[in-house]
Structures are given as C-alpha cells and as structure tokens.
Amino acid sequence: MGYAHPEVLVSTDWVQEHLEDPKVRVLEVDEDILLYDTGHIPGAQKIDWQRDFWDPVVRDFISEEEFAKLMERLGISNDTTVVLYGDKNNWWAAYAFWFFKYNGHKDVRLMNGGRQKWVEEGRPLTTEVPSYPPGRYEVPYRDESIRAYRDDVLEHIIKVKEGKGALVDVRSPQEYRGELTHMPDYPQEGALRAGHIPGAKNIPWAKAVNPDGTFKSAEELRALYEPLGITKDKDIVVYCRIAERSSHSWFVLKYLLGYPHVKNYDGSWTEWGNLVGVPIAKGEE
C-alpha cells in the first residue's frame, strides 16, 4: 500500500522535465536564505520564509491580500502548479507547502529529496534569477481546519487524556525532555521554559526521511506513528519550536498517510514555552 496522496510528491526527474513548463513555478525555500544565491534549480525563485510569510508587527502571517500580491510577483496564478524544495530535507519547503494550503492553493507539490538530492545527482544549477510575467491571484479561502491555535491546544490536551486525540512533538528528544529550548548545536533561545505539552508523544520529524532526504515508505511511516497511538481515527495536533519541523510531519501524516484530521500548531514551543498559565511537562512520557 503506497502513499495516500502520491500526487503531492514529484521526483527530481519530473522537475527537470518541467523546467520549461509555463504552468509550473518552482520555488526554493531554505533555512539558509543565502543558499539560493550560490546556485539553484534553473527557473526557480526564492522564498524568504520570514520576510515573505510573516507580518513583522503582529507576529502572525501576512494577510490574504499580501499573499495574493506575493503570488502575483512570483508569476503565480490560482491555476499554477507550485513545486517547492529546499535544504534540510525540505523542512521549510514543507512549511511553505502548509502555508500555501492554508491559503487555499489547489496544486502544490514537494520535490522529493529536496535540494540535497538535486545537487547529489549532479543536476544543473544556476545563479541567474528568473523573471516571469505577473500572475493573477486571489486567495479563495483560508483553511482553518489545518491550523491549531493555543486555545485549541488547551482543549486538545483534554481530548488526548480521553483517548480521542493525539499530540505529536516532533522536536529532538533533548527539547522534548526539557534539557534544551532549541535543537542541539543551535543557540538556546526563544522560550523561557523548556519541556513539552502534557500528553505529547515525541516522534522527531527527521525519522520520516531516508539518508538521501526522500520520504520513507508508507509502511515505514505507519510503523513510526501507529505504535505510539498516532492513528487515523484521532484528531491530531503536531508542533515543534516555530512550526517548520512540524509542517514536515503534518505533510507526512495528512498527505502521505492520509490522516483526515491533522492540525499544525504554528505557535509551537516559542509560544507555548512563554505563555503564562499553561501546563508543561518534562522528561519522558
């Protein structure tokens, strides 16, 4: 049994075959925002996840109108096929995928294996920045069914206790146990408290990928989640520190395994670890 929605994944071969396709736009989304300038897939444009997606004043996402303007600037219309890829096994590309889906874009795909696979296969790179005619775009709706807010998570803790829901903390075991507030080898910043949301199971996001950055098989992915009670019949909320890693796990659960009710808590530990009056847990559960 394969992936529930194989159409959302494209291979490096597929991308190379569609480099001249006017109906396709390829976007690179990296943690290292300078990486694009060192060489990228021919025709690919750059998304700076912080500058392009976040409102700097309210610490939230840009509005529907601003998203539409961003799409038009990138030459994307509502019927454009958008292909996303990036570094770090596609974690920020997956975040962009989630944000495109939140804004109701119909045809969004991830390049399986991301930037790493493209480079390792010796495929072409360029430093030339492409230019496209402006697109015509209107955000059809915002899909709140895939986004969890802090109040939703507080209510969800009760569902988890009742066996009707599941929480997945996709961070490193050290962050989950409360030993660190960020990944190992990163500056320890962003939260006053360390630990995890009570009831959460720790399934690090990177367990879902192979050494070459491609996703593991559906059978392997089910074996990763189901033994810990992360099953299709439950409402599921995933989180990390600022939602890029949890977007990757959200993609796995919703699109590769076909779980119907999965939300990404984009406030994640940066919000939860700083909130007054909410519970945390430390150690293993």
Swiss-Prot record:
Q: What happens when the gene is disrupted?
A: Cells lacking this gene have a m(5)s(2)U content in tRNA that is about 40% of that of the wild-type strain. Moreover, TtuB-conjugates in the deletion mutant strain are similar to those in the wild-type strain, suggesting that TtuD is not involved in TtuB-conjugate formation.
- List, alphabetically, the Gene3D superfamilies matched: Rhodanese-like domain
> Which Cys pairs does UniProt list as disulfide-bonded?
none
UniProt keyword annotation of Membrane present:
no
Query: Where does the record place the modification Cysteine persulfide?
Result: C240
| Gene Ontology MF terms | thiosulfate-cyanide sulfurtransferase activity
For this protein, the record's InterPro entries field holds: Rhodanese-like_dom, Rhodanese-like_dom_sf, Thiosulfate_sulfurtransferase, Thiosulphate_STrfase_CS
Look up the record and name the pathway of this protein. Answer: tRNA modification
| Keyword Repeat tagged | yes
A Gene Ontology biological process noted in the UniProt record is:
tRNA processing
Write the record's keywords in alphabetical order, separated by commas: Repeat, tRNA processing
Question: In what way is this protein post-translationally modified?
Answer: Cys-240 can accept a sulfur atom as persulfide forms from cysteine desulfurases IscS and SufS.
What PROSITE patterns has UniProt attached to this entry?
A: RHODANESE_1 (PS00380), RHODANESE_2 (PS00683), RHODANESE_3 (PS50206)
Q: Which top-rank group of organisms is this from?
A: Bacteria
Looking at the record, the residues that make up the Rhodanese domain are 20-127, 161-281
The protein's job, in short, is:
Required for the efficient 2-thiolation of 5-methyluridine residue at position 54 in the T loop of tRNAs, leading to 5-methyl-2-thiouridine (m(5)s(2)U or s(2)T). TtuD is a sulfur carrier protein that has a role to direct sulfur flow from cysteine desulfurases to m(5)s(2)U synthesis in vivo. It enhances the cysteine desulfurase activity of IscS and SufS, as well as the formation of thiocarboxylated TtuB (TtuB-COSH) in the presence of these desulfurases.
Q: What is this protein called?
A: Sulfur carrier protein TtuD
- Give the organism, scientific name: Thermus thermophilus (strain ATCC BAA-163 / DSM 7039 / HB27)
What is this organism's lineage? Bacteria, Thermotogati, Deinococcota, Deinococci, Thermales
**Gene that produces this protein:** ttuD
